[in-house]
Amino acid sequence: MSTVEDRKQLIQDVLDTYPEKLAKKRSKHLNVYEEGKDDCGVKSNIKSAPGVMTARGCAYAGSKGVVWGPIKDMIHISHGPVGCGYYSWSGRRNYYIGTTGVDTFGTMNFTSDFQEKDIVFGGDKKLLKITEEIEELFPLNNGISIQSECPVGLIGDDIEGVAKKAQKITGKPVIPVRCEGFRGVSQSLGHHIANDAVRDWVFSRDDAQEIETTPYDVAIIGDYNIGGDAWSSRILLEEMGLRVVAQWSGDGTINEMMQTPKVKLNLIHCYRSMNYISRHMEEKYGIPWFEYNFFGPTKIAESLRAIAALFDDTIKENAEKVIAKYEQQTAEVLAKYRPRLENKTVMMMVGGLRPRHVVPAFTDLGMKMIGTGYEFAHGDDYKRTTEYVDDATLIYDDVTAYEFEKFVQELKPDLVASGVKEKYVFQKMGLPFRQMHSWDYSGPYHGYDGFAIFARDMDLALNNPTWGLIKSPWNK
């Protein structure tokens, strides 16, 4: 029996434990990739099965937690009960430069703290009062976003009307975002709603700071600067002669967002969360966009050359110089870590782009991806994934806690790379684990400098001597 058939049988064994209706539903989300096919063969972006443990988030998480929250010079109000703001408070490690509480506010939590009376009588007056208090207490803020939670949508509060009034009072952008958590099937719709808010409430403004443009102006979009990722990417782009005019949302500002329609090229890192606004700018302003990948030296060089190909010979020559500059550093990293990591197997399950984009970094270290999947991918994500995975790779969409544990128990990977919800489950099973949402409090992982840290962290995870003291359940 081939490996493909083995793994298809594994999927069937897992499905056999479910009731018939659930098994039929989940069977559409699990598959084994077969080389040569142009799709991973799984359904996606569908409501999770009721009653199963899913790692997904909500639309509010996608808007406030991913797209808007990292804009550092704005104050983001979690408009609704206190819990949503509390549990989304500074959890993403979006690094930024500034003085917190004075001119930057990324790690602060602002909430309208809805009470029963606000549900009964509405919260519009309270919200307007909050915007006035914010302006008084934090006068150096450059704008406010209103991130609406579930009750706000259910009672029909007019946050758009409040935003317009607040803008007249403060003279600054006040952006209403209808990202109530019940919308859509995952955080993915929150990304889309947040993108639409940028389109309707930011790009439509005419008060952006005037800047001189150059033929080399670019924007980094969809890099949230986890552990400094955007900084390590920006270094390479600037070394090859490009001018990064805007960087959002990680370490980004509202003015940078306003400037973006003036750039010559949008460089998109997280396709899933920011492709909507990139496509809009392509259609309205004629700005092309390119999805780059700065995970691992192979893809870094490939992306730099592809970006340079969109500019003149000077940029093309500079790109080659940048690649050459880091060859020695990369060779030293590979010489040190590849022998220690060669042929180790990995299973991954994350959101966004990482289930495919991080694969080349593992491959550069000689590691093999045997299973990967997304929390909230769409069909085009799985089409893009075929470029990154090998024959017989297990593919799982919106995988349940039960499925993921069973797959790991059977395939016995050397390393599991997933989120904080999964971290302690697998560590208690005696498996090395890396948290791939926030880089396990390390990073950056982007760029050549980031690859050195990535390699070190994988080595620390896999070759830590403590694992020899713990027996996996299947070895007892």
Curated annotation (Swiss-Prot):
<dbReference type="GO" id="GO:0016612">
    <property type="term" value="C:molybdenum-iron nitrogenase complex"/>
</dbReference>
<dbReference type="GO" id="GO:0046872">
    <property type="term" value="F:metal ion binding"/>
</dbReference>
<feature type="binding site">
    <location>
        <position position="270"/>
    </location>
    <ligand>
        <name>[7Fe-Mo-9S-C-homocitryl] cluster</name>
    </ligand>
</feature>
<keyword id="KW-0067">ATP-binding</keyword>
<dbReference type="InterPro" id="IPR005972">
    <property type="entry name" value="Nase_Mo-Fe_asu"/>
</dbReference>
<feature type="binding site">
    <location>
        <position position="150"/>
    </location>
    <ligand>
        <name>[8Fe-7S] cluster</name>
    </ligand>
</feature>
<dbReference type="InterPro" id="IPR000318">
    <property type="entry name" value="Nase_comp1_CS"/>
</dbReference>
<dbReference type="GO" id="GO:0009399">
    <property type="term" value="P:nitrogen fixation"/>
</dbReference>
<dbReference type="GO" id="GO:0016163">
    <property type="term" value="F:nitrogenase activity"/>
</dbReference>
<keyword id="KW-0411">Iron-sulfur</keyword>
<feature type="binding site">
    <location>
        <position position="84"/>
    </location>
    <ligand>
        <name>[8Fe-7S] cluster</name>
    </ligand>
</feature>
<keyword id="KW-0500">Molybdenum</keyword>
<keyword id="KW-0479">Metal-binding</keyword>
<keyword id="KW-0547">Nucleotide-binding</keyword>
<protein>
    <recommendedName>
        <fullName>Nitrogenase molybdenum-iron protein alpha chain</fullName>
        <ecNumber>1.18.6.1</ecNumber>
    </recommendedName>
</protein>
<keyword id="KW-0408">Iron</keyword>
<feature type="binding site">
    <location>
        <position position="58"/>
    </location>
    <ligand>
        <name>[8Fe-7S] cluster</name>
    </ligand>
</feature>
<keyword id="KW-0560">Oxidoreductase</keyword>
<dbReference type="GO" id="GO:0051536">
    <property type="term" value="F:iron-sulfur cluster binding"/>
</dbReference>
<dbReference type="Pfam" id="PF00148">
    <property type="entry name" value="Oxidored_nitro"/>
</dbReference>
<keyword id="KW-0535">Nitrogen fixation</keyword>
<comment type="function">
    <text>This molybdenum-iron protein is part of the nitrogenase complex that catalyzes the key enzymatic reactions in nitrogen fixation.</text>
</comment>
<comment type="subunit">
    <text>Tetramer of two alpha and two beta chains. Forms complex with the iron protein (nitrogenase component 2).</text>
</comment>
<feature type="binding site">
    <location>
        <position position="437"/>
    </location>
    <ligand>
        <name>[7Fe-Mo-9S-C-homocitryl] cluster</name>
    </ligand>
</feature>
<dbReference type="InterPro" id="IPR000510">
    <property type="entry name" value="Nase/OxRdtase_comp1"/>
</dbReference>
<dbReference type="GO" id="GO:0005524">
    <property type="term" value="F:ATP binding"/>
</dbReference>
<comment type="similarity">
    <text>Belongs to the NifD/NifK/NifE/NifN family.</text>
</comment>
<dbReference type="InterPro" id="IPR010143">
    <property type="entry name" value="Nase_comp1_asu"/>
</dbReference>
